[in-house]
């Protein structure tokens, strides 16, 4: 079964532990982002891995190629399952990121590597005025997606609204990891291009990241099972 990735948007391990206790004995796919990683350091990954959960380490690296390569060598040694970079860092940076993961993983399996195209909080108007990008939002996402594939990465982070176009351009096996997923009853909050788990499945996402709809729910297990059901119909 293709499990949704739960965004552990907490500051402390105690909060994470309390949340994960709801799923005792179950192996989940979770996302550790900047807030949690920077507050706790690499030990947070070790503690979560001890509970047999798959980890997407969402740090969105974006720096000069050699710096990113060195960072990826270290991150690969943590035993995470997936990491990411910003595609805006360029093809060479992404290639160096992949090489770093291969070195860090050694004889083991390297983590999946995906690239952020445009954040789901970014509107087309904001992209064009603030980033001075004259293309449409879709054109920008497809450009970054193509660059990502050329660099030998496994896929991209994208809105579900662009997932089908990316599939047609880059192939079925190219990962399309979609944040901004909400149950129909939830507010969109700070993300603009949001969809439901069911719609994400229908329009071509390969993986979904769900945060508040599960982590802030009165009954996280019930909410998770609802997302799981919609995502795997």
From Swiss-Prot:
GO terms for cellular component: cytosol. The keyword Lyase applies. Keywords: Decarboxylase, Lyase, Pyrimidine biosynthesis. It catalyses: orotidine 5'-phosphate + H(+) = UMP + CO2. The keyword Lyase applies. Signal peptide: none annotated. GO terms for molecular function: orotidine-5'-phosphate decarboxylase activity. SMART domains: OMPdecase. GO terms for biological process: 'de novo' pyrimidine nucleobase biosynthetic process; 'de novo' UMP biosynthetic process. It holds the Pfam family OMPdecase. Its EC number is 4.1.1.23. The active site is at residue 60. Substrate binds at residues 9, 31, 58-67, 120, 182, 191, 211-212. Pathway: Pyrimidine metabolism; UMP biosynthesis via de novo pathway; UMP from orotate: step 2/2. Catalyzes the decarboxylation of orotidine 5'-monophosphate (OMP) to uridine 5'-monophosphate (UMP). Belongs to the OMP decarboxylase family. Type 1 subfamily. Homodimer. This is Orotidine 5'-phosphate decarboxylase. It comes from Listeria welshimeri serovar 6b (strain ATCC 35897 / DSM 20650 / CCUG 15529 / CIP 8149 / NCTC 11857 / SLCC 5334 / V8).
């Amino acid at each position: 079964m293709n499990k949704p990735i739960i965004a552990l948007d907490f500051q402390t391990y105690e909060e994470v532990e309390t949340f994960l206790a709801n799923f005792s004995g179950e192996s989940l796919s979770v996302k550790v982002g900047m807030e949690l990683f920077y507050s706790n350091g690499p030990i947070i990954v070790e503690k979560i891995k001890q509970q047999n959960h798959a980890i997407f380490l969402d740090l969105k690296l974006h720096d000069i190629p050699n710096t990113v390569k060195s960072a990826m060598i270290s991150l690969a040694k943590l035993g995470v399952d997936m990491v990411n970079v910003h595609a805006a860092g360029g093809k060479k940076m992404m290639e160096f990121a992949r090489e770093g993961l291969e070195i860090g993983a050694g004889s083991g399996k390297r983590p999946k590597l995906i690239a952020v195209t445009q954040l789901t909080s970014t509107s087309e108007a904001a992209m064009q005025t603030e980033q001075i990008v004259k293309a449409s939002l879709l054109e920008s996402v497809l450009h970054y997606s193509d660059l990502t594939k050329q660099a030998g990465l496994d896929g991209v982070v994208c809105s579900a609204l662009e997932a089908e176009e990316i599939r047609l351009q880059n192939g079925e096996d190219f990962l399309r990891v979609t944040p901004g997923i909400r149950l129909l009853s939830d507010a969109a909050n700070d993300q603009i291009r949001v969809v439901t788990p069911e719609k994400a499945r229908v329009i071509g996402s390969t993986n979904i990241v769900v945060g508040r709809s599960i982590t802030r729910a009165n009954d996280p297990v019930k909410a998770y099972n609802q997302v799981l059901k919609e995502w795997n119909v």
